[in-house]
Amino acid sequence: MALKTFKPVTPSLRQLVLVDRRELYKGKPVKALTEGKSSSGGRNNLGRITVRFRGGGHKRVLRNVDFKRRENLNVPATVERIEYDPNRTAFIALITFPDGKQSYILAPQRLSPGDKVIAGESVDVKPGNAAPIGSMPVGTIVHNVELKIGKGGAIARSAGNYAQIVGRDQGYVTLRLNSGEQRLVHGQCFATVGAVSNPDHMNISLGKAGRNRWLGKRPHVRGVAMNPVDHPHGGGEGRTSGGRNPVTPWGVPTKGKKTRSNKRTDTFILSSRHNRKK
């Protein structure tokens, strides 16, 4: 979909660039596939802020998106429409099975209303079709890739994202991710063919601070703009550069400090995304 700019009638419209969503369905979602979503404002059960700079925003309704694609195997479904989803950057597709059952899936690029999609052990390499990643040919572009068999897609789910199959060996598939990381995924993990829809999301410009507030994002205050009681970078006469290596408000090194501690799955990462930056 194309990008949309506006005549600069107001200062915020001068910078505003949005994705043109005219081709999307304009009605409400299927009620049976939705549920309410309560907002926490970044607070935990004690009412204390655990995630800073969150709160407010427009009320949302959760769409139950099928990330597993393991029900109704080998049964073709018809794409009814492509919809906007406020809870993610990608678009979603409503699909209908011959028995009348409906579900939402992540909409890949080049998927249109009226198309047929299917999930099964061996399917055509066509956008929207889902299958075990081990049954797909090397070079295939995929998204919504499972890391654990049957748990549902975890990799490449945001707008414009994808991974590429670059090899197969001993029941495992080698994936190249957008970050540059190469990792092993079990061949029985499901993945969906194609790249995620809405690739132009990376080019939007919100145009004003209020549009970020509509998304539930509050102002992100820099540490050097705080007082010493609030942040290690705070204080000083006039503008200062912090006086120490960048840290979080709790003194943990940031901006490049590695925080991964899951040694159990290190063996599945063949090439780290950090290696190409050296």
Curated annotation (Swiss-Prot):
Molecular function (Gene Ontology), one example: structural constituent of ribosome
Subunit: Part of the 50S ribosomal subunit. Forms a bridge to the 30S subunit in the 70S ribosome.
Superkingdom per UniProt: Bacteria
Keyword Transmembrane helix: no
Entry's Gene Ontology BP terms: cytoplasmic translation
Claim: Ribonucleoprotein is one of the keywords in the record: yes
Entry protein name: Large ribosomal subunit protein uL2
SMART domains per record: Ribosomal_L2, Ribosomal_L2_C
Pfam families: Ribosomal_L2, Ribosomal_L2_C
Family, similarity comment: Belongs to the universal ribosomal protein uL2 family.
Protein keywords: Ribonucleoprotein, Ribosomal protein, RNA-binding, rRNA-binding
The protein's role, per its UniProt record: One of the primary rRNA binding proteins. Required for association of the 30S and 50S subunits to form the 70S ribosome, for tRNA binding and peptide bond formation. It has been suggested to have peptidyltransferase activity; this is somewhat controversial. Makes several contacts with the 16S rRNA in the 70S ribosome.
One cellular-component annotation, GO: large ribosomal subunit
Matching HAMAP family: Ribosomal_uL2_B (MF_01320_B)
Region of interest (Disordered), ranges: 224-278
